[in-house]
Amino acid sequence: MAGGRRGPNRTSYCRTPLCDPGSAGGAAHGGMPSVGGVRSRARSSSSTGLSSPPLAAQTVVPLRHCKIPDLPADRHLLFELQLFFCHLIALFVHYINIYKTVWWYPPSHPPSHTSLNFHLIDFNVLTLTTIVLARRLIGAIVREASQGGKSSMPQSLLLVATRFAVLTGTGWSFCRSIILLFRTHSFFNLLFLCYPFGMYIPFLQLGWDFRRPGLSHMPNTRDLASMDRGSKDYLHVLQHILRHHMPSAEPLPTHACCLSPDLIRSEVHYLKLDFNWRVREVLLSSMLSAYYVAFVPVWFVKSTQYYDKCWSCELFLQVSLSTSVILTQHLLPAQYCDLLHKAAAHLGCWQKVDPALCSNMLQHSWMEECMWPQGVLVKHNKNVYKAVGHYNVAIPSDVSHFRFHFFFSNPLRVLNILTTLEGVLIFYQLYSLLSSEKWHHTISLALILFGNYYAFFKLLRDRIVLGKAYSYTAVPD
């Protein structure tokens, strides 16, 4: 400035990273990568609201994970039996809505000795719908009979006979129903049965089942690239669709709890694929079950038959939401959500800040081999980011890392969402039950509520227990 007096020469602040790239990448359980050799001072930034972390905070402190109790869970076969029973109840109440009669009328009116018009029901459609709804239960029975282990000769014969009887009976009933439907209905009506399976192919776009290998055998980048370049022909996708709807009782992944940034990012990548697969399984299974419960029976109703279309759409939403909550609770148990929470805590998160607010603060060049402590400012792709997590190895510009940390930083987030959805659904069903004036609506809602009560009880129990467990002081593993 003209006429002004220049101050002393300003100190040249170094731009060295917070960790030694040669030692941070190979850290494991035995050693903690500490931030050494950093002698940086932050300039005064009281006007901007940002501050550089003190020197003591620039040392990565090991995480202490909270131990959660082992909550009781239903066996896989028992769970599939309960889910099939809930679907049968929904299908039964929908048939009441379609084929109800006025059996209480006096003989002067059109007489009816039964509560349903059984002569109008197409039992071939009913058989086919029941088999589709029981697909997971059939797969669970066959898998349970195939995994008998070491057993005596009579037990082995019994398991083989059970497997043969289930598969033969299911296949014979399915083929017989399809043949009889071809004789009595048009080809266009039969395409309505295959509509969900045709929609799966563009929706799934699967090339590999990532849930089969364990975390100890995580696929590397070359394997993932070769999987993505693999052929996705029609038969290959159909194979994955059938495998997708078969229940899996495989053990949950385990948490590596490593300190290498590359291994942490690889673990998060695998868990992200596994979580997306489980969510996709929940969505497609619930939509398929709701489709066959609510829409397939009304499509094969005769044109002279009257039914409540609004109730069919409402039943579709209720069945899809109930099935989604029940399947999510089974496929994403508390131990699995805790595993995702631990991985998110190791991954960390970055928050994008305005460069004008931190122009007078120390900014480091982000390096993928480093483990950055909380509050550090880094430069990445011409942007400035601030470390938010306990320690951070995520890529600042990777949106998937940000979403993973945001969604699983709270270990109770998934459980809170499920509990809220189930509570809202039960409240709506109770309100509809109290305000209903038709007898078949009253019976339908009363029967459907029983399954939702049991699911809500388990969700509320897990929420109370885990809420108290996470509220206590973290206990080291």
UniProtKB/Swiss-Prot annotation:
Glycosylation sites: N9
Sequence intervals crossing the membrane: 76-96, 114-134, 158-182, 187-207, 281-301, 414-434, 440-460
Key words of the record: Endoplasmic reticulum, Glycoprotein, Membrane, Transmembrane, Transmembrane helix
Positions of the UniProt region annotated as Disordered: 25-54
Classification via Pfam families: Tmp39 (PF10271)
Positions with biased composition (Low complexity): 35-54
Subcellular location per the Swiss-Prot or TrEMBL entry: Endoplasmic reticulum membrane
Gene Ontology CC entries for this record: endoplasmic reticulum membrane; membrane
Protein's recorded name: Transmembrane protein 39B
Species assigned in the record: Xenopus laevis
Gene (UniProt): tmem39b
